[in-house]
Amino acid sequence: MNKVNQASLTAPLAVPAFRSLWSASIVSNIGAMMQAVGAAWLMTSLTESTLLVGLVQTAATMPVFLVGLVGGAMADLADRKKLLFWSQVWMLVMAALLGILTLGHFTTPAVLLGLTFAIGLGRAIGLPAWQASVQDIVPKPLVASAVSLNSIAFNAARAVGPALGGLLVAATGAAFAFFANAASFLAVLFAVNAWKPEKAPAPRLGEDIFGAIRSGFRYLLHAPRLQAPIIRATMFGLCAAAVWSLLPLLARDVLHTNATGYGVLLGAFGAGSIVAGTFLPRLRNRFALEGILALGTALAAVAFFALSFCRQPWPAGVSLFFAGMAWVGVLVNFNVAVQTSVPDWVRGRALAFYLLAFQGALAISGALWGWLAGVIGISQSFAVAAVGLILSLAFSKFFPLESDEEIDLSPSPAWPELHADLVADPDDGPVLVTIIYDIAEEDASNFRALMRIMRERRLRDGARRWRLYHDAKDPERFLELFRLDSWGEHLLQHQRTTMEDRELEAKVLSLHRGKERPLATHYFGDDE
């Protein structure tokens, strides 16, 4: 990917809607961190079971796996502003209810886990809508800086929130940490309510949630440009997430520090994350994206190697500072790559796939690195993770990130009407579409190459099967054939067309020798 002039880090803050939503997200993220501290501490006072204490974190994160894709589909089908608003209302009510029950001493382990899970549901539904809304709020040139600012907001909250939560719980009890979290959602509600989208949500033909999830999977299967950042972020996460599993063990058993020292080490990681976020726009102006990703991955590997030799807290803190820089430097760019590689109609689902894959990598790595530390040792496990990070660089060869600077993924103007006189129900089907091309022999090779790309586009946007044929008697006559489940799916296929797709169509048509457009015919399945 070529380097391109990027907006400064603070440029998105000049957009009033983004500025207010970003500020509100800081408040909300701090509230979420305080909630996590309060829930974990309350569970330790309700039970001596280490399993139940561990299940608090599971209850908070499991909704991403269960309904994350539903949230992504809803972000694409529904009004994102309304979805954001009502997901915040849901979380506010659940957090306030938990605070009230705790204040009245009615909270049991089951109640705590249930309401923690309920709050997680709201987050799993709202997060894809929030991330997909970035391009609805700021122009495309500001997206990378906006994502960097969101990362800074999260890491700043992660650095401050647990400390504030601990102080509040110690002073007033866990109930008030839950009330603080509930109050933090008010900031987001006010910001969302004040946001006036410049353009109304694009009208979408009827599609249910499960149909949208299926079409999202189909898009992912036939979109290498989306697969690449998801696969590479997953591989990076499997190795880099070793820090979350191994750091508590390193602090306790190798550095021999206490909880305060562990908090300082986490703070060093968070500080590095914030610093990296401020420098990313400058790096993007100077280096190509692949270069930044390679630099960040190598920096993480060096930091992990250093941690494998650390026996004192201060050098470990320095190493974690650079590890935090690498973490944000790599993941922000993968997030930007996902957001800018897909059109608006599927962006929520694309981000849901990304979040699901990355969270899955974190979950797997937790067990993997914990097990490995018990087998070969903590320091040695950091060294293995460093080697894994270096090896993960090889994935850039097999899954390169394509340049998005010249790609126009905006919706295409409407195609020519599909048989305006045809009376068909959206559920009618299956539908078979045939298109006949007249291609000169000397252009056949170029035509076939373009049609291989066309195949992926057709399958990605709704077709079930696709095939290209040539006439046995007239080798310059080609037949494109693809099948869809219903007439409604074919209408959706047209609605999903982007300007990039139209450019491909124009290249194909330039090889067609006929004076008229290639003849397209639509057939409906007939069981009689």
Which residues fall in each region the model found?
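Helix-loop boundary and gating motifs at the non-cytosolic
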Residues: 4-62, 218, 222-267
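Membrane-helix boundary and inter-helical linker elements of multi-pass secondary transporters
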Residues: 14, 45, 76-77, 105, ...
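Substrate-agnostic recognition of the 12-TM MFS/MFS-like secondary transporter fold
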Residues: 17-37, 60-94, 111-170, 185, ...
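Transmembrane alpha-helix termini and helix-breaking/packing motifs in multi-pass membrane transporters
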Residues: 40-47, 98-104, 160-180, 253-255, ...
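C-terminal transmembrane bundle of multi-pass solute transporters/carriers
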Residues: 66, 81-83, 97, 109, ...
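Helix-loop junctions on the cytosolic side of multi-pass membrane transporters
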Residues: 132, 136, 178-208, 286, ...
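An amphipathic, aromatic/His-enriched active-site/gating alpha helix that lines ligand/cofactor pockets
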Residues: 402-405, 458-465, 483-519
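Short, glycine- and small/hydrophobic-rich beta-strand elements in well-ordered beta-sheets
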Residues: 455-479
